[in-house]
Amino acid sequence: MEYFLRINGKLDNLNDYTSACRTNPYKGAQMKRKNEAKVITAILEQLKRLRIKKPVYMVYDWYEPNKRRDLDNISSFGRKVIQDALVETKVLTNDSWRDIVGFQDNFYIDTGNPRIEVTIKEVEKTNER
């Protein structure tokens, strides 16, 4: 089974988060909560009360307004926030190796409509890692 989640706009990146944490640990925590709240809102609207019990493979399509931000900075913090929000809303049981077997990042430019599209694919259990 496949599920789709769309998050409009963009999330803060790893450089923003690292800078906030260096300024003040509370500021970093506040930034993470703000980003998670945005993702949780999208999850509650689109995935409703979905509960996935099988392991998943996740595909992230990042649509940026331009090429200013480094790819790894966009995806690293963004994946963390999205996966934590999926666990917080109980869509996923956990974000461990057993629950998320892998992921893929794709990057695109869409100047008028930045967004993140996440495809969550259930997979059959593989050998324990």
What are the residue ranges of the model-derived segments?
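Catalytic phosphate/metal-binding cores of nucleic-acid and nucleotide-processing enzymes, i.e., regions
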Residues: 1-129
